[in-house]
From Swiss-Prot:
UniProt-recorded name of the protein: Guanylate cyclase 2D
Predominant subcellular localization, coarse grouping: membrane
The protein's Enzyme Commission number: 4.6.1.2
Similarity remark: Belongs to the adenylyl cyclase class-4/guanylyl cyclase family.
Subcellular location: Cell projection, Cilium membrane
Tissue-specific expression: Specifically expressed in a subpopulation of olfactory sensory neurons. Expressed in the cilia of the olfactory epithelium.
Guanylate cyclase domain mapped to chain residues: 893-1023
Record key words, sorted: Cell membrane, Cell projection, cGMP biosynthesis, Disulfide bond, Glycoprotein, GTP-binding, Lyase, Membrane, Nucleotide-binding, Olfaction, Sensory transduction, Signal, Transmembrane, Transmembrane helix
Native source organism of the sequence: Rattus norvegicus
Chain's gene name: Gucy2d
């Protein structure tokens, strides 16, 4: 019959006995045949062939009905997986088609035929195959891959065709997609509900078909609200299985693992490796139950059946004790087999267990489609594959291994059986029956054998109740009262914790190592001697020197008693034996310690950095209050810069600036803008380390709105223009910003570089400068000459005072750039020198080694360059200082070539373009030389000279090497195009001559390896008298080539006038036997033709066209 003839090949090729051996559905990608997989299925090749031949012979005996043919396509990955191939879709479909065509009760009015459509394992290929057979079949059996089921259903609905698939789910009521089996998720859910297991993981094979199956299964389980702890796919080999086992170990409370892959009982290697790994990792000790997914799709034989794979593999047999196999139930004797045997269509000794399990699923799908088509024709719809799902109602017919029962809603109601092993035998024992119509699991009397003796613990029943919200296995309504009580207790505890914390904070202000409030008893106030320095304009930013010109010793000699009366006249004190500085508030102003103020003070107290003065506490007295700060004896940066007796070189300045940048960067990283940064607020300690002070002072005043007079214009010279233009506060300009600090840093950079006050070069008053800065244009900035510091530092300074705040760099950027300017020097000058000396002494040996390696590297580079310019032997002699003696070579072949029209091309091109195209051309030629035994002598302009047989003699191979090279160069030259003039061809001509010559080095400066002798002149004459795209060969070279008998193709040119030689017989080298590259076609030139003028005119025309296009 036609169906049998199309059973193996999708395009209708004959399937006869000889084709069976190479039929792709029966043979995997590695040549794995049914004989090699007899552990998976006991189908014998001989029985299958015998069965197929009998069916074919039987079909030939049927009369040929003159009826219309209804062709169905069987979709599946039959050609990419040996296990899928074992389903034998052609045999299964043929058996069902024969039954349908011979069933008198089915009045189809048409002849049922089929085509096998292999789709591959990946979803895109499968969908493409499906679309390609739109017009070749009337309905489809499949898809097997659920990944393209939605797309296939939509396309089939538009085409007016139906899909009968056991792997795709569909809404009730039929339509384009007709499921031949119930939802696999519902089947698994019924089993899980029976055993009380809700927490699951899904592990799939790496194949696209199984990954998609796992994803859709997870979606279905999530729709039921089940907790999925893991969805993953196996990697290659044991390593991938081990990784999955580790992931399963990490999932808490896991009960079941659904395995979306081929069953180990059917030869599934991935499931076998995974189960062995699970046993090795201790996952098969009873804590988990493994459920294979693929066995849900077919009836797995189990009656009087032993699986050799369990007998032959002890670890797998032990691991399979943790597996529950759910499969369609099978009857003792299939009606399909009974009918076939009665009519002699199969061997008498062939039983149902010898058929691959998916075989029966395909068979049942065809039977179901035939009955739907029969019902459709009976109701007058006609022979059509559309809406067949609407014609499957209340059906009860014999299937392959059990009866096919369809209820009134079109749902199939098969019976599933749960199979188990005891970990020792190789047989599957039925323990439960699942009735799909009631979704109830009934025991059969044999208990499930769980490893360890007991099943995994049951999960909360709320997971399976659709009317109950289940959160982590707990019903929220039952715990609502507990949650309410917990919240109330938490609120009460929170209030108690707040008040306790508030009390502890108040206590921490006065006690402990991190206390903030200091008492007069903790400070020793010292009377200051009269100052001989000029007073500072900013009373709140006084110099940090101990006595403004005195020393600590003079202060101690003046007074060592605690005299509170001196407090109004001093800014220094002793605290815990260390000097401290008092940053006083305005007279009569007592700070209000609000929560915001205390938070700011605690933040300041916690700040510790080498370049930020430490805040030690707050002193609140009856008349005077002050911040207690770390003391720096060398005064402010402004004092240091104004001291003309102190010499400051760049190293010193860079050290101070780097300290300033580090301190400000630290404040910004702590989200603490300064707001009042100036050279007076930068102090220097005895080690010449610069520290930033007065940080937080403005914020503290703002936190409790303390009054302070407006600062003088001289105090605003460091202020950013946007702050000057902003709303004024009672104590100064606008709120502190990070970008405002960057501007102030730029002004300090100008002070350090010039050692002059800000904007000193303008010669204007501070008030006028502030007005110009706040109201540009013109832009008013300090002027710094290039000789007052490194150019990079001046450029960085100018970036810092950009008008737009967003254009100014961040402190991280400033720090990185300044480190590069300062070459990574440390902050302290003395420390930097000591560290430098120590580093130098420690790294001297490494430095010597590094320089030695660099010298060796340069030596190698020099030798490599010398060897590229001269032969290795000559280069070695020159390097050793020995004389290079000229050498006579009795037989060499020399190659000359040039570019026809090069002079015209050079005249019409820019010099840089000429160099570029010559470099491209000669680079291509040089690449050809690498594969031949030749030596490149030189290139002069467009002339290219190569020789073979020197400096290394190669016997009589010199002519062949040059000839092969010349042919290859000519082949590449024919396709070469100039980058600046791609439409202008490059025509190369070459000349070859063989003979003796002398080679030697000429000169001491830029020595050259030169060739001398008449052979060189003759080769040059051969090139100059040649023609474009031609290889001009002398008689000597021709004789050398013919003596080698390598199949060179040589044409006689005739007598040619050679300068200094007269007329000589010359030849053209046109090819070689076995040379496969194409050669450019030479110009047809007759004697006396002005071919050079024609070529030059062609070049000019090409450049003119290029100029017009440009």
């Amino acid at each position: 019959m036609a169906g049998l003839q199309q059973g193996c090949h999708p395009e209708g090729q004959d399937w006869t006995a000889p084709h069976w051996k190479t039929c792709r559905p029966c043979q995997g990608p590695r040549g794995l045949t049914v004989r090699h997989l007899r552990t998976v299925s006991s189908i014998s090749v001989f029985s299958v062939v015998f069965w197929g031949v009998l069916l074919w012979a039987d079909s030939l005996s049927l009369p040929a009905w003159a009826r219309e043919t209804f062709t169905l396509g069987v979709l599946g990955p039959w050609d990419c997986d040996p296990i899928f191939a074992q389903a034998l879709p052609s045999m299964a479909t043929q058996l069902a088609v024969d039954r349908v065509n011979q069933d008198a009760s089915l009045l189809l009015g048409s002849q049922l035929d089929f085509k096998i459509l292999p789709t591959g394992c990946d979803t895109p290929h499968a969908l493409a195959t499906f679309v390609a057979h739109r017009n070749t079949v009337a309905a489809f059996i499949g898809p097997v891959n659920p990944g393209y089921c939605p797309a296939a259903a939509l396309l089939a609905q538009g085409w007016g065709k139906s899909l009968f698939s056991w792997a795709c789910g569909a809404p009730e009521g039929g339509g384009a997609l007709v499921p031949t089996l119930p939802s696999m998720a519902d089947v698994l859910l019924s089993v899980m509900r029976h055993f009380g297991w809700a927490r699951l993981a899904i592990v799939s094979s790496h194949q696209d078909i199984w990954v998609t199956t796992a994803q859709q299964l997870a979606t279905a389980f999530r729709a039921h609200g089940l907790p999925i702890g893991l969805i993953t796919s196996l990697g290659p080999g044991e390593k991938g299985a081990t990784e999955v086992c580790k992931q399963l170990h990490s999932v808490h409370g896991l009960k079941i693992v659904v395995l979306c892959m081929h069953s180990a009982l059917l030869g599934g290697l991935e499931q076998t490796v995974l189960l062995r790994c699970a046993r090795k990792e201790g996952l098969t000790d009873g804590r988990l139950v493994f459920l294979p997914y693929d066995t849900l799709l077919f009836a797995l034989p189990y009656r009087n059946r032993s699986y050799l794979v369990l007998d032959d593999d002890g670890p797998l047999q032990e691991a399979y004790d943790a597996v529950l196999t759910i499969s369609l139930d099978t009857s003792p004797e299939s009606h399909a087999f009974t009918a076939t045997k009665m009519r002699g269509g199969t061997a008498a000794n062939l039983g149902p267990e010898q058929v691959s399990p998916l075989f029966g699923t395909i068979y049942d799908a065809v039977i179901l489609l035939a009955h739907a088509l029969n019902h459709s024709e009976a109701h007058g719809t006609g022979l059509s594959g559309a809406h067949l799902g609407n014609h499957i109602r209340a059906l009860d017919v014999a299937g392959f291994s059990q009866r096919i029962r369809i209820d009134g809603k079109g749902r199939r109601l098969p019976q599933y059986v749960i199979l188990d092993t005891n970990g020792e035998g190789s047989q599957l024992v039925p323990t439960h029956i699942l009735d799909v119509s009631t979704q109830q699991v009934q025991p059969l009397g044999t208990a499930v054998h769980f490893p360890g003796g007991s099943p995994p613990a049951r999960d909360a029943s709320c997971w399976f109740d659709p009317n109950t919200l289940c959160i982590r296995g707990v019903q929220p309504l039952g715990s609502l009262l507990t949650l309410t009580i917990t919240c109330v207790l938490a609120l009460v505890g929170g209030f108690l914790a707040y008040f306790i914390r508030l009390g502890l904070q108040q206590l921490r202000l006065l006690r402990g190592p991190h206390r903030i409030l200091l008492t007069p008893q903790e400070l020793t106030f010292l009377q200051r001697t009269p100052s001989r320095r000029r007073p500072h304009v900013d009373s709140g930013s006084e110099s940090r020197s101990v006595v403004d010109g005195g020393s600590p010793q003079s202060v101690i000699q003046g007074s060592t008693r605690s005299v509170p009366a001196f407090l109004e006249h001093t800014n220094v004190a002793l605290y815990q034996g260390e000097w401290v500085w008092l940053k006083k508030f305005e007279a009569g102003t007592a700070p209000d310690l609000r929560p915001s103020s205390l938070s700011l003070l605690r933040k300041m107290r916690e700040m510790r950095h080498e370049n930020v003065t430490a805040f030690l506490g707050l002193f609140v007295g009856p008349e005077v209050s002050a911040m207690v700060l770390e003391h720096c004896a060398r005064g402010s940066l402004e004092d240091l810069l104004r001291n003309e007796d102190l010499r400051l070189d760049w190293t010193f300045k860079a050290s101070l600036l780097l300290d300033l940048i580090r301190g400000l960067r630290y404040l910004h990283h702590r989200h603490f803008p300064h707001g009042r940064l100036k050279s007076r607020n930068c102090v220097v300690d005895t080690r010449f380390v610069l520290k930033i002070t007065d940080h937080g002072y403005a914020e503290f005043l703002e936190s409790h709105c303390s009054f302070r007079p407006q600062p003088a214009p001289e105090e605003l010279l460091w202020t950013a223009p946007e702050l000057l233009r902003g709303p004024r506060r009672p104590w100064g300009p606008g709120k502190a910003t990070f970008k405002g600090d960057v501007f102030s840093l730029g002004i300090i950079l100008q002070e350090v570089l010039t050692r002059d006050p800000p904007y000193c070069s303008w010669g204007l008053s501070a008030e006028e400068i502030i007005r110009k800065v706040a109201s540009p244009p013109p832009l008013c900035r300090p002027l710094v000459s290039p000789d007052q510091g490194p150019l990079e530092c001046i450029q960085l300074m100018q970036l810092c005072w950009e008008e737009a705040p967003d254009d100014r760099p961040s402190l991280d950027q400033i720090y990185t750039q300044f480190k590069s300017i300062n070459q990574g020097k440390k902050t302290s000058v003395a420390d930097s020198m000591l560290r430098m000396l120590e580093k130098y002494s420690q790294s001297l040996e490494g430095l010597v080694q590094e320089r030695t390696e660099e010298l060796e590297l340069e030596r190698r580079k020099t030798e490599r360059l010398l060897s590229q310019m001269l032969p290795p032997s000559v280069a070695h002699a020159l390097k050793m200082g020995t004389t290079v003696e000229p050498e006579y070579f009795d037989q060499v072949t020399i190659y000359f070539s040039d570019i026809v029209g090069f002079t015209t091309i050079s005249a019409l091109s820019e010099p840089i373009e000429v160099v570029g195209f010559l470099n491209d051309l000669y680079t291509m030629f040089d690449a050809v030389l690498d594969s031949h035994d030749v030596y490149k002598v030189e290139t002069i302009g467009d002339a290219y000279m190569v020789a073979s047989g020197l400096p290394r003699r190669n016997g009589n191979r010199h002519a062949a090497e040059i000839a092969n090279m010349a042919l290859e160069i000519l082949s590449y030259a024919g396709n070469f195009r100039m980058r600046h003039a791609p439409d202008v061809p490059i025509r190369v001509r070459a000349g070859l001559h063989s003979g003796p010559c002398v080679a030697g080095v000429v000169g001491l400066t830029m020595p050259r390896y030169c060739l001398f002798g008449d052979t060189v002149n003759t080769a040059s004459r051969m090139e100059s008298t040649g023609l474009p795209y031609r290889i001009h060969v002398s008689r000597n070279t021709v004789q050398a080539l013919l003596s080698l008998d390598e199949g060179y193709k040589i044409d006689v040119r005739g007598q040619t006038e050679l300068k200094g030689k007269g007329l000589e017989e010359t030849y053209w080298l046109t090819g070689k036997t076995g040379f496969c590259r194409s050669l450019p076609t030479p110009l047809s030139i007759q004697p006396g033709d002005p071919w050079q003028d024609h070529i030059n005119q062609e070049i000019r025309t090409g450049f003119a066209k290029l100029a017009r296009v440009g």
